[in-house]
UniProtKB/Swiss-Prot annotation:
Gene assigned in the entry: kdkA
Record key words, sorted: ATP-binding, Cell inner membrane, Cell membrane, Kinase, Lipopolysaccharide biosynthesis, Membrane, Nucleotide-binding, Transferase
The species this protein was found in: Haemophilus influenzae (strain PittEE)
Name the UniProt record assigns to this protein: 3-deoxy-D-manno-octulosonic acid kinase
Catalytic reaction list: an alpha-Kdo-(2->6)-lipid IVA + ATP = a 4-O-phospho-alpha-Kdo-(2->6)-lipid IVA + ADP + H(+)
Active site (catalytic residues): D171
UniProt similarity note: Belongs to the protein kinase superfamily. KdkA/RfaP family.
GO biological process: lipopolysaccharide core region biosynthetic process
GO cellular component assignments: plasma membrane
GO terms, molecular function: ATP binding; kinase activity; phosphotransferase activity, alcohol group as acceptor
Localization (cell): Cell inner membrane
Pathway in which the depicted protein is active: Bacterial outer membrane biogenesis; LPS core biosynthesis
Statement: the UniProt record of this protein carries the keyword Lipid biosynthesis: no
Membrane topology per record: Peripheral membrane protein
Length: 241
């Protein structure tokens, strides 16, 4: 792992070397000129999927950090700087690395960057993570099919592993769970660990699970996904095993 600075930019890479063109790796225009953009997804901003397996060992997802809500309309992507390790991209990078090393199915962090403003008070942030191949989020799948009992149980076990590490996923919802079609069968992945972190005690775990259930119930009405109380019961049974 290598951490370094170039002018007003700070980088961390999951490699034991620096890169002269490090800035370009976080610019969508660079990858477009290289004809290496293989897809994109819309959220708060655009996540670009990149053909980088020959460079980084895996294909990547490039994401810029944007604010949401009313504040985001006034200040779309600048955050107050206090310490490098607590910046949005560096914090998510380190958390993903911790979970990846613990064996949880999360994207491997590849690199992160922050760029300070002229006064050094604020910064903008970007992150490169592993692209999970042959995968869709649960809401997309559940619009067209039901999922087997074992898949719901797998989700329950995954969340339990996360909670046993005392990690609170602050945006745990159906869109942040991917289902991958792998050789060994279906595999669940967790995404988007921005603003997530360690939390003591157990009181928040039920709230976290309730948040996930509400997200499924919301998408039943909004996207007509196929989700039942029995699905949730299967998930919870595995969680409590």
């Amino acid at each position: 792992m290598q951490q370094f600075q170039q002018d007003n930019q700070y980088f961390i890479f999951n490699f034991d070397r620096t890169f002269e063109q490090a800035t370009e790796f976080f610019q969508a225009e660079f990858w477009q000129k290289q004809e290496r953009v293989i897809g994109s997804a819309k959220g708060r901003g655009t996540t670009y999927f990149l053909q980088t397996e020959d460079w980084f060992g895996v294909n990547c997802a490039l994401r810029h950090y944007y604010r949401g809500g009313l504040w985001g309309k006034l200040n779309k992507d600048r955050y107050r700087f206090s310490a490098l390790e607590t910046t949005r991209s560096f914090a998510e990078f380190h958390l993903l690395q911790r979970l990846y090393e613990a064996g949880l199915p999360v994207p491997k962090p590849i690199a992160a960057r922050i760029q300070k403003g002229k006064l050094g008070i604020c910064y903008q942030a970007d992150i490169l993570t592993e692209k999970i191949e042959n995968a869709q989020d649960l809401t997309a799948l559940l619009q067209t099919q039901t999922l087997p009992k074992e898949t719901w149980r797998q989700i329950g076990r995954l969340i339990r592993k996360l909670h046993d590490l005392q990690i609170c996923h602050t945006d745990l919802n159906a869109h942040n769970i991917l289902l991958q079609q792998a050789e060994q069968g279906q595999k669940c992945w967790l995404l988007d660990f921005d603003k997530c972190g360690e939390k003591s005690g157990d009181f928040w775990k039920v709230q976290n699970l309730n948040r996930l259930k509400r997200s499924f119930e919301k998408e039943v009405g909004r996207m007509n996904i196929q989700f039942t109380e029995q699905n949730w019961a299967d998930l919870m049974a595995a969680y409590h095993q």
